[in-house]
Amino acid sequence: MTISHIDPEYQANTIEPSVQQDWENRKVFKVADTVEGKHRYILSMFPYPSGKLHMGHVRNYTIGDVISRFYRLKGEAVLQPMGWDAFGLPAENAAIAHKVAPAKWTFENIAYMRDQLKKLGLSVDWDREFATCTPEYYHWEQWLFVQLYKKGLIYRKLSTVNWDPVDQTVLANEQVENGRGWRSGALVEKRDIPMYYFRITDYAQELLDDLDTLQDGWPQQVLTMQRNWIGRSTGMEITFPSANTEIYADGLTVYTTRADTLMGVTYVAVAAEHPLALKAAENNPELAAFIEECRMGSVAEADLATAEKKGMATGLFVKHPVTGEELPVWIANYVLMSYGSGAVMAVPAHDERDFEFANKFNLPIKQVIDAKGADDADYSATEWQEWYGSKEGKLVNSGEFDGLEFQAAFDAFLAKLEPQGLANSKVQFRLRDWGVSRQRYWGCPIPMINCDTCGQVTVPEDQLPVVLPTDVVPDGSGNPLNKMPEFYETKCPCCGGDARRETDTLDTFVESSWYYARYASPDFTGGMVKPEAAKNWLPVNQYIGGVEHAILHLLYARFFHKLMRDEGVVQGNEPFTNLLTQGMVLADTFYREAENGKKTWFNPADIELERDEKGRIISAKYSGDGQEVIIGGQEKMSKSKNNGIDPQAIIDQYGADTARVFMMFAAPPDQSLEWSDAGVEGANRFLKRVWRLVASFLEKGNSATAIDKANLSKDAQDLRRKTHETIQKVSDDIERRHAFNTAIAALMELLNASNKFEAKDDNDVAVEREAITTLLTLLAPFAPHLSQTLLAQFGTDLTEATFPEVDASALTRNTQTIVVQVNGKLRGKLEVSVDISKDELLAQAKALPEVQQFLTGPTKKEIVVPNKLVNLVV
């Protein structure tokens, strides 16, 4: 076969558009809803259509694409879809700022970002694309909501929530940072509003147990974070009888995991919203004002843990269940109404928050646990020590319970109090039910109707979807749906009377909790997912995304999979068999600081750098004025630090393949990647060298393909061995280890070996050809445009190519390198047959001229370490 000639220089901007057009024309990445044979579902977390891709996107989607292309080469049908997480606050805020409808803003962004993703060369089945803001998608979300509401898995209740007064919406606890809204930065308030909740707590035990099934496929860090978030604890509910029965007859029930410290209780603390607190405040204006102050703060657990401890005595008392001693009841801002019963038994001697509170308000502190292994450790009531909170040690100052250790004490208190109706053992979870109502416009409408006669009624299934009006330009003052009678005025499905449609929309985490399943059959009109498509493609074999989603998104998606399973929509218990959490992309930061401390950040593209001989930055100047800026070090690429690198600029200058290779080579995927212009140039040089190697080979015009293995020269044997070692390593690095950086390093070694090889006959040419076509095929997952273009010169269509098989015979070595030492010092090396005899090896070692000059005396000892060395002791 005659081999064609190619341009000697690599021109990425010429080849990439034509290759991408070829893929699109032939729909080479399209898969059916059901396929025969081996198949695999690879999914990277879908993007929010913010307007432009950032480097985090590029890294995420390149990782997914490398894995997808690898398995296609292995002969599997691969589903790799793409879509848009399109609802949410940012779109609404941007729409307010630009005075445009969120729908228009969103779909314009999608169009631009879709084009950017296609230019990355992703092997995506674009026929499966959808945006979550379309009625065709959220129809089925509403359908599931209705089913779950009817089953009691969704309920409505008045709830104290975090209210962001700027964004005019409820925030989840995780969206409150240091008492402020995560997006607006406004001080968060507390409000009581009616909200819909998913009973995720009904699934808490299963969500916890099933983490064990993910042990081999998920990072331990993520499993640990989820276990801690679900937070299963076994404790005791203890009732402290009321000492003021005329005011509050019921007493106080608390939940504790430290029942062993019961004899150290010196006060009881309740949340500001607790019924006892409200009762005590009825005739106490000062207490009522304090309760209102507490209500203005965040309800996020992390914030309460670190906030200044505030409290006020209610004037009410309860009785210690064992001793009958009267204990004061305090309102404390560190007690959560949403956890347990909203009341805690305070043991200042052995709980750090109680200790801090008791010292601030001069409350008694009573030690009831000794210091295990530290008999000489004195208990100080003024300075907290780590051992105070330990479960180790024995009870002291606890009367009949003295000397008991943790579990024995727990059992003893339960045995004493349970018959009196004052205690019972209880399992509790830290996980709270998921509040999904959002007082915003740009979200999925909640399919509920409020009727004065019938209460809350689900929208009939034949009236779904409840379609969100899209021609709305919000002005920032609350939810525009509340100003649209044409949306909210309706009839009650039960009584036919006038009713009001729910104007709250769903938390956008709901959309991203089931999108992975919809990709299996995105056009299906009969339900959330076509049953046979779900059976074929689910669960996702490999999921890829940032570790920042370890708790919320991944927990909610796991929850939704179980909900859909119980509705008969999907099979199996878990949505994602394997999870890869990629690290952040870091870049240099540069800034100037004003006298008032305000920092102005400059983009790296606008900075002129001076480096020392080791390449380290020693000075930086802003190109706009030539003046110096401060070098801030490498941080995560972000808008706030203005250190993002535009992927489009890299693609325009170097091509997508260079961006992909750099991203995969610069760091292991689960670690932070430090952006480096020199690294990008290095990746580009590597691809240019591959191109030149192929151009040079084609220039010679020799078409020999048949390898005569029995008559290979030593150099040809070495190149074949390198070729097949590389196949072995790249396969293992991609499939098992996800070590894409070392896979590329192995390809660089094969390139070097191929460049050094000089073919002397047709057999050599065939070996060189094998090395080059193998290099191109193994490189294809990383640099698909270049590989497809160059493989075509050898008559191979990349889209139909298969991953090379390892020839075991090529890996065997006929010769070996032996080190020769005299008195333990290296004096020479031998290249000998692998089956050489010991006597022959010693003879050749002694015959080496560079060895002979050191053999001046009689040889005392001859040491041979097989396959490694000869040591002659003289």
UniProtKB/Swiss-Prot annotation:
Q: Which UniProt keywords apply?
A: Aminoacyl-tRNA synthetase, ATP-binding, Cytoplasm, Ligase, Nucleotide-binding, Protein biosynthesis
Q: Which residues hold ATP?
A: 639
Q: What is its EC number?
A: 6.1.1.4
Q: Which Gene3D superfamilies match?
A: 2.20.28.290, 3.10.20.590, HUPs (3.40.50.620), Isoleucyl-tRNA Synthetase, Domain 1 (1.10.730.10), Valyl/Leucyl/Isoleucyl-tRNA synthetase, editing domain (3.90.740.10)
Protein location: Cytoplasm
Q: Which positions does the motif 'KMSKS' region occupy?
A: 636-640
Q: Tell me where the sequence motif 'HIGH' region sits in this chain.
A: 47-57
Top-level EC class as recorded in UniProt? ligase
One CC-aspect GO term:
cytosol
Q: Out of the domains of life, which is the source? A: Bacteria
Q: What cystine pairs are annotated?
A: none
- UniProt cross-references to InterPro entries, sorted A to Z: aa-tRNA-synth_I_CS (IPR001412), aa-tRNA-synth_Ia (IPR002300), Leu-tRNA-ligase (IPR002302), Leu_tRNA-synth_edit (IPR025709), M/V/L/I-tRNA-synth_anticd-bd (IPR013155), Methionyl/Leucyl_tRNA_Synth (IPR015413), Rossmann-like_a/b/a_fold (IPR014729), tRNAsynth_Ia_anticodon-bd (IPR009080)
Q: Which GO terms describe its molecular function?
A: aminoacyl-tRNA deacylase activity; ATP binding; leucine-tRNA ligase activity
Q: What is its main location?
A: cytoplasm
Please provide the Gene Ontology terms (biological process) for this protein: leucyl-tRNA aminoacylation
The chemistry this enzyme catalyses reads: tRNA(Leu) + L-leucine + ATP = L-leucyl-tRNA(Leu) + AMP + diphosphate
Residues annotated as coiled-coil are none
Annotated family: Belongs to the class-I aminoacyl-tRNA synthetase family.
Q: What is this protein called?
A: Leucine--tRNA ligase
Q: Which organism is it from?
A: Acinetobacter baumannii (strain AB307-0294)
What gene name is listed for this protein?
leuS
